[in-house]
A protein has these predicted regions:
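Metal-associated gating/positioning segment near the N- to mid-region
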Residues: 52-118
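C-terminal cap of metal-dependent C-N hydrolases
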Residues: 328-371
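Divalent metal-dependent hydrolysis catalytic cores, especially in the metallo-beta-lactamase
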Residues: 83-112, 124-141, 155-168, 186-189, ...
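N-terminal metal-binding scaffold of metallo-dependent hydrolase/deaminase domains
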Residues: 1-44
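Short, acidic/polar
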Residues: 77-84, 142-153, 198-207
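Active-site core of metal-dependent hydrolases
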Residues: 159-280, 297
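Glycine-centered positions in the ABC transporter ATPase nucleotide-binding domain
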Residues: 9, 31, 55, 360-365
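His/Asp/Glu-enriched, well-ordered alpha-helical/loop segment
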Residues: 258-337
């Protein structure tokens, strides 16, 4: 199927190096984008579906890189069904598991956590809630695991690994585990900051640097932040991606963004939610964090959208997150909210307001079926 989106007000690329794309149209064929910016009259005539954006802003589908997936569209943490479809209505077209740690009675032995990760991965290969793409199955690192265990899950399709909730005695125990997981080819993430569940312990800034994962999860606190001085050290002296989350400390979120920009490390700055957790379920979490940073600090909205799209895709090696030819056709239309003081979505977000999102309340876009 071919779909044309026309009369777009602005196109946000998802690329932190060039955040806006000139033009007013996007063409999709099958599951991929084929043209972004300019399309021909023939492209429009040949399309099966034509969407008139009516001046709305097009952005890449948002990627939430910190979602505590379990099984199905259900979270036992808040006993809620349908939360992933709600996130889709909030513009999130891709969710990435932050480990299936909330599964009731979840195993803590190597064989058990391996089986859990593989089962989650396999289930979501066959299930897309509301159409959302879910990268599930994040291996929880537990004592006794070896490089053979990491290679075993990799051979079954699992590529994510999470440190921070295992039954280790101290944070330093994760240093060799994360190192071996990385050598095996797993993409490693680390709980950062204060303890978030009973029986766990804090991961300090010094621990983070020593463990050296690919991504520091909720570096701004999950929900309690690490010491301020480490934000500059991580941005300046490491290659660790700095993920800030809605369910964390807003002050250190802005501090992290400022340090990332200061040290030319903004490509490693990621925006996520860290939900569902005790902090709740946040379908608009990414939108709120973008608007909060933009309105309280000197950051452009398109750059912050990139932190929740293209930056994440580049970090995790995904084919989504960018509005460019060849990428997954994940497109979200956003607009100024009804009753707001601003005239377009980007200005609304800069003003600290949430934006209207395409499928449920974008006031200008409409679908025209081509005969």
């Amino acid at each position: 199927m071919k779909t044309a989106i026309i009369n777009i007000g602005q196109i946000v690329s998802g690329n932190i190096q060039a955040t806006l794309t000139a033009g007013d149209a996007i063409l999709r064929e099958g599951e991929n984008l084929t043209k972004v910016g300019q399309i021909s009259e023939k492209d429009i005539e040949d399309s099966d579906v034509i969407i008139d954006a009516g001046g709305a802003v097009a952005i890449p589908g948002l990627i939430d890189s910190h979602v505590h997936i379990t099984f199905g569209d259900f979270t036992p943490r808040q006993n809620t069904v349908g939360y992933l479809q709600s996130y889709l209505n909030g513009g999130v077209t891709t969710s990435i598991s932050a480990s299936e740690v909330h599964v009731p009675g979840r195993p803590k032995d190597p064989d058990g956590v391996k089986a859990l990760a593989v089962a989650a991965k396999k289930c979501f290969e066959n299930y897309r809630p509301g159409g959302m793409r879910v990268h599930a199955g994040s291996l929880i690192l537990e004592p006794g695991m070896t490089i053979a265990d990491y290679q075993d899950v990799l051979s079954k399709g699992v590529w994510l690994a999470k440190a921070g909730f295992g039954a280790v005695k101290s944070a330093s125990d994760y240093i060799p585990m994360v190192s071996e997981a990385k050598k095996a080819g797993l993409f490693t993430t680390l709980h950062t900051g204060g303890a978030s569940i009973p029986g766990s312990f804090p991961i300090t800034g010094e621990d983070l640097i020593n463990i050296n994962p690919h991504v520091s999860f909720h570096i701004n606190g999950g929900p309690v932040s690490m010491e301020d001085k480490y934000f500059e050290i991580v941005a300046r002296d490491t290659e660790i991606a700095m993920q800030v989350c809605t369910a964390g400390n807003l002050r250190t979120t802005i501090l992290c963004a400022e340090m990332a920009r200061k040290h030319d490390a903004f490509e490693r700055f990621l925006i996520a939610t860290d939900t569902p957790t005790g902090s709740g379920i946040m379908p608009l979490g990414l939108i709120y964090t973008i608007s909060q940073i933009a309105s309280l600090a000197d950051f452009d909205v398109p750059a912050l959208i990139a932190a929740a799209t293209g930056n994440v895709a580049k970090c995790y090696g995904l084919n989504s997150g960018f509005l460019k030819a060849g990428c997954d056709a994940d497109v979200v239309l956003i607009d100024a909210p009804l009753g707001g003081t601003q005239n377009d979505a980007l200005a609304a977000l800069k003003n600290g307001d949430p934006c209207a999102i395409g499928r449920n309340n974008c006031r200008r876009a409409k679908i025209c079926w081509q005969e």
